[in-house]
Amino acid sequence: MKQSFSRLFGLNDKNDDAELTANEEVQQLAIKDIVPNRFQPRTLFDEDRIAELAQTIRTHGVIQPIVVRVRDDKYEIIAGERRWRAVTSLQWETIPAIVKEFNDSQTASIALIENLQREGLTAIEEATAYAKLIEIHNLTQESLAQRLGKGQSTIANKLRLLHLPQAVQDAILNRDISERHARALIALKDAEAQEAVLKQIIEEQLNVKQTEERVKAYFKTAEEEAPKKKKPKRKSYPKDMRIAMNTIRQSVDMVMKSGLKVDTDEEDNEEFYQFTIRIPKKK
């Protein structure tokens, strides 16, 4: 049987949780005393979906209590932030909740895992959740992939998005561009270039293929505009002078081939070219 994410991260299974909470007291906690989870990977909540949930709660009430823990003088949400937001929008004063004891590591893991099992996270939110799980549990990308039942390349590709400029990450969070758009921008190593192409994507409503072509064009333009490396100019000498210089060099070579050690220096002065030949008196 496939193990749940929770059990793989050293936490109780949801089914075990249900059995444990069956006998736990459901309390009515004041909305004003409840704060969101600090480790919540979801940074943007769909207001329309929250409004729909609020309407359902108005009609049927909160069927499943939220789960919280005591932190300082407040209750921090562990699971159920959407329900809490919906009830808050209804301006109700209390919400049914179960108070549990969890440390920071457990609280973060539950929040991250719960959200990873839901749909609707943006690629950046998902990448942030992976990064936090790796940090909290001291995992490698490979071991995290195994625990989540995903390919290592999937984890790696998501994490690369976190190296993009904040402007690009914000565009993903706001769903202005897709993950595939963002991955095309990764090829541009320069943040300024990435932001420039991002602007084109949004203003011109480029699709992924057009974005990839724009990235290729950016590379081509940059290459054409880059200053060409000039080859050092070879100094030109009159023909007679070149013959004389080569004759001296050949003569030195002949002497050296005879076994005699010869030291030479050449110096190009403004008015003359100087050869210095030194022949030691002693071998």
From Swiss-Prot:
Q: Which residues bind DNA?
A: 142-161
What keywords are assigned to this protein?
A: Cell cycle, Cell division, Cytoplasm, DNA-binding, Septation
A GO biological-process term:
division septum assembly
SUPFAM superfamilies found in the cross-reference section: KorB DNA-binding domain-like (SSF109709), ParB/Sulfiredoxin (SSF110849)
Q: Which residues form the signal peptide?
A: none
UniProt keyword annotation of Transit peptide present: no
Entry annotated with the keyword Cell cycle: yes
First-listed, main subcellular location of the protein, grouped into a coarse class? cytoplasm
Where is the protein localized? Cytoplasm, Nucleoid
Pfam families, alphabetized: HTH_ParB, ParBc
Task: Name any GO cellular component annotation.
Answer: nucleoid
Single Gene Ontology MF annotation: DNA binding
What does the function comment of this entry state? Effects nucleoid occlusion by binding relatively nonspecifically to DNA and preventing the assembly of the division machinery in the vicinity of the nucleoid, especially under conditions that disturb the cell cycle. It helps to coordinate cell division and chromosome segregation by preventing the formation of the Z ring through the nucleoid, which would cause chromosome breakage.
Q: Which PANTHER family match?
A: CHROMOSOME-PARTITIONING PROTEIN PARB-RELATED, NUCLEOID OCCLUSION PROTEIN
Protein family: Belongs to the ParB family.
Which NCBIfam families did the record assign? nucleoid_noc (TIGR04285), parB_part (TIGR00180)
Identify this protein by name. Answer: Nucleoid occlusion protein
The opening ranks of the lineage are: Bacteria, Bacillati, Bacillota, Bacilli, Bacillales
Q: Gene encoding this chain?
A: noc
